[in-house]
Amino acid sequence: MKKNLNDFKRLLLTACCTLVLSCGWATVNEKPFVIPELKQWSGAEGMFTPSGKYVVKGGKNAQEVAKLFAADYHDLVGKPLTPKTGKPSAGDIVLVLQSDKKSARLLGKEGYRLTIGDVTTITASSVEGLVWGTRTVLQLSEQQRSAGFVLPKGSTQDKPAYGLRGFMMDCGRKFIPMSYLRSLVKMMSYYKMNTLQIHLNDNGFRQFFGNDWAKTQAAFRLECDTYPGLTAKDGSYSKAEFIELQKLAEQYGVNIIPEIDVPAHSLAFTHYKPEIGSREYGMDHLDLFNPETYKFVDGLFKEYLEGKNPVFRGKIVHIGTDEYSNAKKEVVEKFRYFTDHYIKYVESFGKQAAVWGALTHAKGDTKVKSENVMMHCWYNGYADPKEMKRQGYKLVSIPDGLVYIVPAAGYYYDYLNCQYLYDSWTPAQIGNEKFEENDSAILGGMFAVWNDHAGNGITVKDIHDRLFPALQTLSAKCWTGAATSFSFEKFNRLRLALSEAPAVNEAARWQKGKQLRIETLNPGQTTGEKEVGYGYRVEFTIEGADEPKGTVLFSSDNATFYLADPESGQLGFAHEGYLNKFNYRVEKGKKVTLAITGDNRKTSLYVDGKLREELGPLTLYAMQQKDLATFQKSDATAWQPVVYNPSAKMHYQRTLVFPLQKAGDFKSHITGVKVSQK
């Protein structure tokens, strides 16, 4: 009996030890990687396996979010997500929209609660919060492609550190197609960036256009009935499609801020109506002392703001006020009057006004309304942020020295320093001024793309290449603030595994190891691939024929690659109004193997395995009389050279995202087509 009792004690002790050890070694899921980073995470054991069903609790608005989520889920993972009613079962995803005060207090306007157990539940007190919760689930899902799109069990209560998280696109100097803006809305939503500012008018720099304002590039991009002929001829948006863009953005939780920039950066308006241009400060400045200026600008804003269903649907409208001259006291006071007038004019239509910070640069006595006015603080010499806070403005942190992208300009950033921003910046840092985190005066942060050098060869694909890593980085810093816990090395490595957005691939990235092979390419043939992005190699063997000028090898919606370009009959490519050519012609009866490679800096041609030519950046100089260098003559008969020492230069880009959608109508015999991407 005693022996049996001892055996029982040993068995009991063993069982207890086993239980303790198993509990101690149980695998609790670490915080999963998403962008922006979850503010907090409570891990659990195991994985959630999706059933492909979802349940909605919360009325019509919740149903609309669920439909959007289901469509994006299908696009992203390739599997349907269908609705069901009744009690959720294991593997179901539940979307809950609660409007009670407790949820609103805990989650705020954009927060959500995500619980992943046998059932996954997204709970929010607002439509925006519910949308953001679905973005988290989508990002978690796509990282588990090889495991069947399972989700790590655990829970989070996630809400942003800053209420405004955004980006500004200069569409005035460089036309950005509506198709890209629609993709951009989806990308921003996927990374919980909630503000897209569209800069609708601007102009190039006069020195690149013969120092002639009349010849200098300028554009206003929106359809305009009030002033027929004002709208740009080289690319514009109809009012109907601009409204549809805003509706799409509303679905995705993104606010569109349209910007009409006055009274500087206004050459498009003075091209149309020269009498309102300033003869003293330049025709890119409106004449603030001319009553016709105010009639014109009033009429312009009114067209987009009046009526029950205005073209500008959102709550905020940006009136510009950027970089006007402060040369004289009287012009400073008139600028302040102009700014105050248009803040109040926009408000008269029920909108909130936004301005570029300029009131330190234009310091004066004329009062400018500050209550409920949004100010973009971009350069502290133009608007001292602490003084603007004291005056009562609501600030947007967009410091030029940190978050301005000016593609290929040679100043500001070509690509943002994402490591510095990730490690060291939050919206509380405006230039050299540091505010407390979550200071109530700071609405949030943005970055910007300014296309200063109109005509420099930069394409939308080049802009996208610069924009996307910045978007991911600013997303993290504007949502999570100073509380990021992942190292930049980990962030920078894992961000590459995430999509741009469901069904969006503007960079034309291919899956690792993917290739396109075509044994014989026939005229007019479609390939099943639209294009291939940077890091590509396109190789083929060609037995040349007599190809007329304009003969196409491949084309897509974005670009055309020529066997014989339309101007000179050389190998070349065209996109967005630019034509670039290699110094090479396809020769009749000659058989060669050609390869074209391309990255974000250059496009290269190889002939029979040897590099023939690289089309990299070209430095172009603006020659002006003031740059003429003078030399002392040794005597009256000595020859004097004409030498320029130009300070203004442009770096013309010759990159290409290679088109593959459709073969052209060529005569040459083309075989062995092979396309790959690093």
PLM segments and residue spans:
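Extracellular glycan-associated modules
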Residues: 509-678
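Hydrophobic faces of well-ordered beta-strands that scaffold small-molecule active sites
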Residues: 165-169, 196-198, 256-260, 315-319, ...
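Feature activates predominantly on carbohydrate-active enzymes
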Residues: 105-285, 292, 298-316, 451-453
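Acidic, contiguous N-terminal accessory segments
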Residues: 6, 23-160, 353-362, 369, ...
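Bacterial N-terminal signal peptides that target proteins for export
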Residues: 2-13
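Flexible, acidic glycine-rich loops studded with aromatic residues
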Residues: 367-373, 380-519
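Active-site neighborhood of glycoside hydrolase catalytic domains
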Residues: 269, 274-372, 378-391
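Bacterial N-terminal signal peptides
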Residues: 13-22
